[in-house]
From Swiss-Prot:
The keyword Glycoprotein does not apply. It comes from Arabidopsis thaliana. This is Nucleoid-associated protein At2g24020, chloroplastic. Disruption phenotype: No visible macroscopic phenotype under normal growth condtions. Increased number of plastoglobules (lipid bodies) in chloroplasts. GO terms for cellular component: chloroplast; chloroplast envelope; chloroplast stroma; chloroplast thylakoid membrane; vacuole. InterPro entries: YbaB-like_sf, YbaB/EbfC. Belongs to the YbaB/EbfC family. One of its GO terms (biological process) is protein import into chloroplast stroma.
């Protein structure tokens, strides 16, 4: 009879390895301790540990020499490829910004009485006003300066968009992508 009780307890422990079973408890009255249950505001919650990326190859024999870890097996390679692409884009973007900062765009008013020069980053560099524009009065001069500034700004923006579009195409992006971001 003692061997029968030992066999029953052994069988129960094999079937329910994460349960506490007292000697006289039945299978229905067992209290499971795994997964751990925690009481929260909305009731009990359980904590489980699940393998997300497959597992290791136990026999270390692989047909193609690579570890097969389920559907995410090549995740590290994809991550490294994305990181390299980001680095290339950052380097190219910095180079384009430096080129634009060095470029100068001149804008003129009607009659070319006022000339405004902007950088490729739309930073004002200088304003040239002729003697003839000075004689027109402050109100008219203000309009001419504004007109010249708008002309220079428009030229700078067009050049910047063209340069960014060229950059996007050199990186393999579709040519019409930048037009949709207006």
């Amino acid at each position: 009879m003692a061997s029968m009780a030992a066999t029953t307890n052994f069988t129960k422990s094999m079937l329910f390895p994460f349960s506490h079973v007292s000697g006289n408890a039945s299978l229905n009255s067992q209290r499971r301790t795994w997964p751990k249950q925690y009481k929260s505001k909305n009731g009990y919650r359980s904590l489980r540990v699940n393998g997300l990326f497959g597992g290791g190859n136990k026999d270390n024999n692989s047909e193609d020499g690579q570890s097969k870890a389920g559907i995410f097996g090549n995740m590290q390679n994809m991550y490294e490829t994305v990181k390299k692409a980001q680095m290339v884009v950052q380097v190219e973007a910095v180079r384009v910004q430096k080129e634009l900062a060095a470029a100068e765009f001149d804008g003129y008013c009607a009659g070319e009485l006022v000339k405004v020069t902007l950088s490729g980053n739309q930073q004002p560099i200088r304003t040239d006003i002729t003697e003839a524009a000075m004689e027109l009065g402050s109100e008219k001069l203000s309009q001419l300066v504004t007109e010249a500034y708008k002309d220079a700004h428009a030229k700078s923006v067009v050049a910047m968009k063209e340069r960014m579009s060229d950059l996007a195409q050199s990186l393999g992006m579709p040519p019409g992508l930048s037009e949709g971001m207006k």
